[in-house]
UniProtKB/Swiss-Prot annotation:
Gene: yidC
Domain of life: Bacteria
Function: Required for the insertion and/or proper folding and/or complex formation of integral membrane proteins into the membrane. Involved in integration of membrane proteins that insert both dependently and independently of the Sec translocase complex, as well as at least some lipoproteins. Aids folding of multispanning membrane proteins.
Source organism (scientific name): Buchnera aphidicola subsp. Acyrthosiphon pisum (strain 5A)
Primary location: membrane
Subcellular location field: Cell membrane
Membrane-spanning residues: 7-27, 336-356, 413-433, 450-470, 492-512
Upper lineage: Bacteria, Pseudomonadati, Pseudomonadota, Gammaproteobacteria, Enterobacterales
UniProt similarity note: Belongs to the OXA1/ALB3/YidC family. Type 1 subfamily.
GO cellular component, one term: plasma membrane
Name of this protein: Membrane protein insertase YidC
Pfam families xref list: 60KD_IMP, YidC_periplas
One Gene Ontology molecular-function label: membrane insertase activity
Membrane topology type: Multi-pass membrane protein
Quaternary context: Interacts with the Sec translocase complex via SecD. Specifically interacts with transmembrane segments of nascent integral membrane proteins during membrane integration.
């Protein structure tokens, strides 16, 4: 009975945690504010449908608006929009009901991106389509604008094969007799409330992940910043020499990594309370008369592949959202990746990692069963104490403590494996919903995506049957309270219903873990019976 009760306590705690997490993520939706928006960034929100150019390497396809040179659309060619879609996943887009853009420019006293005149440079290019060839090591896409006083601005997008980072390079030539002062900025803008077509997991509390802004600075390696904070004008203003700014969602990220020109300013802003902005602004860059200056920054548009992000910028790989158990999820993911490199199937890798985890916790499991067996053996003595001192609860507690000390039993020993296994289980959950490598990863037969729910609910039903079997071999026949007995008998049905929406990979882990529990329980109890 103790095994069964502990098992359901574990499941209940996990589901309760997920429900709380889903509630927390929805708290900001109705919050509003009447505070004014910083006018410095008003011009960024002007919608100009000017000429566009198209840039493509083997993994990303970009659409750049020549009015300002912003990246208004980005498709990830190696990732499908949905499991059965032939369209690539569109990360950045500019539509009537949703905007997600990566913007950059030169602002300040002499910058062409003017907040005062509400205008931006209209660049030109020698063609509309730029594609990285099969044998080319680099694609350079220059766009050009010349100011009225003859200053030449050349903005170049640099793409490399099989890379999601894009180098943005400004080449500013100042032919005048006056110095020019300007700042480079890079920012990401996104509509806060998702349209229905993008909000695919809105009804699934088990697949909720962080969506919002994030940054890295001198003082913080990685810090999330919720959209509701930006919408309520609780804005950032951080001076830092290192770091980056980003917007995150499940599996994918867009990030600006500024060049180290001194103290950059990280900021956030809200446009009409429905659009969030996070960005950076460099210190003043001086361009002397009759000289040129090269100003660089880097843009990441792609999946959260940790080993690649780590090479692009320090701490950028931390954007993979493993929640508060990242210190467990990261080594688990590395182990899972090693297993996958050997087996070649993520599902079988999950099965194998389950055996490994349960093997490592076997000594605790064994200690749990031994502790429970001793507790059952003491039940007659415990009952005798309760009857003898029925009118003195304090005396009952004292006598029971003395009994536990005499028999060398820890009454809480049976709960220890729960507190060991629950973090492992939760970290695996975070890993499954946060690792892009598992997105659309097939297993066998009808399971084509281990990161999403079972479309036919077969795995949750099997999981429920294993819970029911654990309940039966633990036996509820000796429960005297009829209500408690009914509740315990109904628990497998309740948790089967909860697990209908869980990722298939997590349900698979739970099934295998339950089967291991059954085998271990039979083996340990059998040995205990023999040794009596």
């Amino acid at each position: 009975m103790e095994v069964q009760r502990n098992f359901f306590i574990f499941a209940f705690l996990f589901v309760s945690f997920l429900l709380w997490q889903a509630w927390q993520s929805q708290m900001f939706l109705n919050k509003k504010t009447n505070e004014k928006i910083d006018p410095i960034f008003h011009f960024i929100d002007v919608k100009k449908n000017k000429k566009k150019i198209f840039i493509k390497n083997d993994v990303i396809s970009l659409v750049v608006n020549m009015y300002g040179g912003d990246v208004e659309e980005a498709s990830l060619l190696a990732y499908k929009d949905t499991l059965y879609s032939s369209r690539p996943f569109k990360l950045l887009e500019t539509g009537s009901d949703f905007i997600y853009q990566a913007q950059s420019g030169l602002i300040g006293k002499d910058g062409p991106d003017s907040s005062i005149n509400d205008s931006r440079p209209l660049y030109s290019a020698n063609k509309n389509f730029f594609v990285l060839g099969p044998n080319e090591k680099e694609l350079r896409v220059p766009i050009k604008w010349v100011s009225k006083n003859g200053v030449i601005y050349k903005k170049t997008f640099i793409l490399k094969p099989n890379r999601y980072d894009v180098q943005i390079e400004y080449d500013v030539y100042n032919p005048s007799k006056e110095s020019l002062n300007m700042n480079i900025f890079g920012q990401i803008k996104q509509t806060i409330n998702l349209p229905k077509k993008r909000n695919v997991y809105s009804g699934n509390f088990a697949l909720q992940t962080f969506r919002g802004a994030a940054y890295s600075s001198d003082d913080n390696k990685y810090e999330k910043y919720k959209f509701d904070m930006i919408a309520n004008n609780k804005n950032l203003h951080i001076m830092t020499e290192s770091g980056w700014i980003a917007m995150l969602q499940q599996y994918f990220a867009v990030a600006w990594i500024p060049d180290n020109l001194g103290k950059n300013t990280i900021y956030t802003s809200s446009l009409d309370h429905d659009t969030a902005v996070i960005g950076y602004k460099s210190p003043i860059i001086n361009i002397p008369p009759n000289s040129r200056s090269i100003i660089k920054s880097k843009l990441w548009i792609g999946p959260e592949i940790q080993k690649e992000m780590k090479l692009v910028a320090p701490n950028l790989d931390l954007t993979v959202d493993y929640g508060w158990l990242w210190f467990l999820s990261q080594p688990l993911f590395k182990l899972l990746t090693i297993l996958y490199s050997i087996i070649g199937n993520w599902g079988f890798s999950i099965i194998l990692i389950t055996f490994i985890m349960r093997g490592l916790t076997y000594p605790l499991t064994k200690a749990q069963y031994i502790s429970m067996a001793k507790m059952r053996a003491l039940q007659p003595k415990i009952q005798e104490i309760k009857e003898k001192f029925s009118k003195d609860k304090q005396r009952i507690s004292q006598e029971m403590i003395l009994l536990y000390k005499k028999e060398k039993i820890n009454p809480l020993g049976g709960f220890l494996p729960i507190f060991i296994q629950m973090p492992i289980f939760l970290s695996l959950y975070y890993m499954l919903i946060g690792s892009v490598e598992l997105r659309h990863a097939p297993f066998l037969l009808w399971i084509h995506d281990l990161s999403s729910q079972d479309p036919y609910y077969v795995l949750p039903v099997i999981m429920g049957l294993t819970m029911f079997f654990i309940q039966k071999i633990s036996s509820t026949n000796h429960i005297s309270d009829p209500l408690q007995k009914k509740i315990m008998n109904f628990m497998p049905v309740i948790f089967t219903a909860f697990f209908l929406w869980f990722p298939s990979g997590l349900v698979l882990y739970y099934i295998i873990s339950n089967l291991v529990t059954i085998i271990q329980q039979k083996f340990i109890l059998s040995n205990l019976e023999k040794n009596r």
